[in-house]
UniProtKB/Swiss-Prot annotation:
Protein name: Replication protein A 14 kDa subunit A
Family annotation (SUPFAM superfamilies): Nucleic acid-binding proteins (SSF50249)
Keyword Nucleus found: yes
Subunit structure comment from the entry: Component of the heterotrimeric canonical replication protein A complex (RPA).
Single Gene Ontology MF annotation: DNA binding
Organism of origin: Arabidopsis thaliana (Mouse-ear cress)
Location of the protein in the cell: Nucleus
Residues bearing the modification N-acetylmethionine: 1
Function description: As part of the replication protein A (RPA/RP-A), a single-stranded DNA-binding heterotrimeric complex, may play an essential role in DNA replication, recombination and repair. Binds and stabilizes single-stranded DNA intermediates, preventing complementary DNA reannealing and recruiting different proteins involved in DNA metabolism.
Keyword annotations from UniProtKB, A to Z: Acetylation, DNA damage, DNA recombination, DNA repair, DNA replication, DNA-binding, Nucleus
UniProt record, GO biological process: DNA recombination; DNA repair; DNA replication
Amino acid sequence: MDTSSPSAFVNGALLRRFIGQKVRTVIQVTGSEIGSVVGKSTDDLQIVVRGSSPPSPLTTYLEVIGIAESDNAIRAETWTNFGNTFDTQNYNELCKLANGEFKHLFI
């Protein structure tokens, strides 16, 4: 595993704590336009993702790794389709643990 450029696990609410830093999140795609994808975070907040071209075709759930530009926008470096079913509650809890009590276990 490459640890030279770690990314924080975030949901929509946590994104604002990492502006200017590398993050990773999973969104439920709700729309796409040329140059951007709009999605719902695992805690039901809207996130706009811009940057490199997303995979085609898009699945319902998408992992994005990139730089947090604002409290609701990410500039994507890597996109990964996560399929059409995904346990958003578990991922949301992972984000809370990775930024809270068990932060020391995550890069």
